[in-house]
């Protein structure tokens, strides 16, 4: 269990954390900090293989929602936001901490990357943030905050 600090600055706030893979994930550090200040969290995991690593962390966070989210699978992003709407009716913040690039796009010179590799990288690493913002907007009736991470390789 994550200890909650006495000054619960985020008490009553509800947030979605996307990108926890294990205890070394930047998203995990963000989630611990948000929880420590009293936020209630929804956490996603990539697939069944990742679930075995993320589920114990979600328990430690006392996450109210734990759902699969492969952003390249049609309907999964929508399902996450539908569940948040059903359970909470609102959303105060989203942490988008995911990125992906095909192996061949990570090797060699950037000018040699294939169109397909580049588009896959942009879809997962960038466009999904925009899509999540679109899906979050109706739940952020009083405003909200969107966080995304970058990497020095970008």
Question: Which residues does each predicted region cover?
Answer:
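Canonical Rossmann dinucleotide-binding motif of NAD(H)/NADP(H)-dependent dehydrogenases/reductases
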Residues: 7-43
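Conserved mid-core segment of classical short-chain dehydrogenase/reductases
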Residues: 58-59, 67-78, 82-119
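Conserved glycine-rich Rossmann-like NAD(P)H-binding loop of the short-chain dehydrogenase/reductase
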Residues: 39-53
């Amino acid at each position: 269990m994550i200890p909650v600090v006495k000054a619960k600055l985020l008490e009553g706030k509800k947030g979605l954390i996307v990108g926890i893979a294990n205890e070394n994930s930047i998203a995990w550090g963000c989630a611990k900090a948000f929880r420590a200040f009293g936020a209630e969290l929804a956490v996603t995991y990539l697939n069944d293989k990742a679930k075995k690593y993320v589920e114990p962390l979600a328990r430690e966070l006392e996450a109210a929602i734990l759902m699969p989210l492969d952003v390249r699978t049609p309907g999964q992003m929508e399902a996450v936001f539908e569940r948040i709407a059903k359970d909470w009716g609102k959303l105060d913040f989203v942490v988008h901490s995911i990125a992906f690039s095909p192996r061949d796009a990570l090797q060699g010179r950037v000018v040699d990357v294939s169109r397909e590799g580049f588009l896959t990288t942009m879809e997962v690493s960038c466009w999904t943030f925009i899509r999540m913002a679109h899906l979050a907007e109706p739940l952020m009736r009083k405003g909200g905050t969107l966080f995304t991470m970058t990497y020095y390789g970008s």
